[in-house]
């Protein structure tokens, strides 16, 4: 099981997420738990590596326009950002 590490920006982003419907918040928790256990995400989450400024990171789509950016290094799951595509990539 990976140790969790949250970036300061992720903490700010997450404050917005907790205002979403509870089912979305639960889904975020389920995705993070799956990653923390080291299990592979279901195909529906479209997990893939990133390039450019985010090289070395991955993202997955918790919902169609709710993206989680993360990185796994040694025994740590680093949660970098969470939000819509436009918030994260524009």
Model regions and ranges:
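Basic, Lys/Arg-enriched alpha-helical interface segments
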Residues: 1-64, 72-78, 88-90
